[in-house]
């Protein structure tokens, strides 16, 4: 995945519909929230929505729903790290006349909607393999109930498909990185995924029982303490 030090790196959805930067370094959190809402209006306008003098939706494009729903598998207890984000977004969108219902449901309800491709919007967390292959989640062969039905975004884009196949057939890390960056840009243009956080693993060991100098150096989610267990020393 692209890193902050890479040339051209920027945060996801940090420009408006015209490509202008939404945020600057002088903004506090409240100013950023306000700027993000104004930028959201530019995207709605590009999609065909019109707004009245009070800044609320006056009309929607043909075929657009009057309200939206996001499913969160919080078991009805708000037990999910993105619940607060979704409810804050709902309140913000309400101020411009867009209704976003946050539906906190059980895992089975959420899973049935996801597998049946009936969920309008949803939140989830997953982990990729050590080989960051994008085929399963984003290739059109797994969309619309086909293949593994694991492309829940239903994205069907020949250009994206070609990049995914190109990237997975090369063992050159730098080349794959450049190809996948292009693929990620297409995915962002589709607007089907909003990255929220990346979970980090933590390894805790007792220095009384373990010689910590024998733990693997620079551990990652894919190369943990078990990866070099044959050299691990205990006291």
Give residue spans per PLM region.
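Residue-level detector of functional hotspots within protein domains
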Residues: 35, 84, 107, 146, ...
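Bilobed periplasmic-binding protein-like "clamshell/Venus-flytrap" ligand-binding domains
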Residues: 47-75, 124-125, 170-207
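Ligand/substrate-recognition segments at binding pockets and active sites
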Residues: 4-6, 19, 23-37, 47-128
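Sec-exported extracytoplasmic/periplasmic mature domains
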Residues: 41-50, 91-98, 115-119, 127, ...
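Generic hydrophobic/packing signal
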Residues: 36-37, 41, 87-91, 100, ...
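Short, solvent-exposed loop/beta-turn-alpha elements that line the ligand-binding surface or hinge
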Residues: 2-38, 53-66, 113-117, 137-169, ...
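Short beta-strand-centered segments that line the small-molecule binding cleft or hinge
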Residues: 132-135
């Amino acid at each position: 995945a692209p890193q902050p030090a890479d040339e051209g790196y920027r945060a996801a959805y940090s420009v408006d519909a015209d490509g202008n930067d939404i945020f600057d370094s002088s903004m506090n959190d409240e100013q950023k929230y306000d700027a993000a809402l104004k930028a959201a209006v530019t995207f709605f306008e590009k999609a065909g929505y019109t707004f009245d003098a009070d800044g609320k939706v006056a009309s929607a494009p043909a075929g657009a729903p009057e309200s939206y729903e996001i499913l969160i598998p919080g078991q009805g207890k708000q037990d999910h790290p993105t619940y607060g984000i979704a409810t804050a977004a709902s309140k913000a969108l309400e101020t411009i006349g867009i209704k976003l219902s946050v539906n906190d449901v059980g895992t089975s309800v959420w899973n049935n909607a996801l597998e049946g491709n009936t969920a309008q919007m949803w939140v989830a967390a997953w982990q990729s393999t050590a080989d960051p292959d994008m085929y399963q989640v984003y290739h059109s062969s797994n969309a619309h109930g086909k293949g593994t039905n694991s492309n829940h975004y239903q994205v069907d884009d020949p250009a994206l498909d070609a990049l995914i196949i190109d990237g997975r057939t090369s063992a050159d890390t730098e080349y794959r990185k450049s190809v996948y960056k292009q693929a990620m840009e297409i995915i962002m243009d589709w607007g089907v995924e909003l990255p929220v956080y990346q979970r980090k693993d933590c390894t805790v060991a007792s220095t009384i029982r373990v010689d910590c100098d024998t733990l693997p150096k620079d551990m990652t989610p894919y190369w943990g303490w078990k990866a070099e267990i044959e050299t691990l020393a205990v006291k």
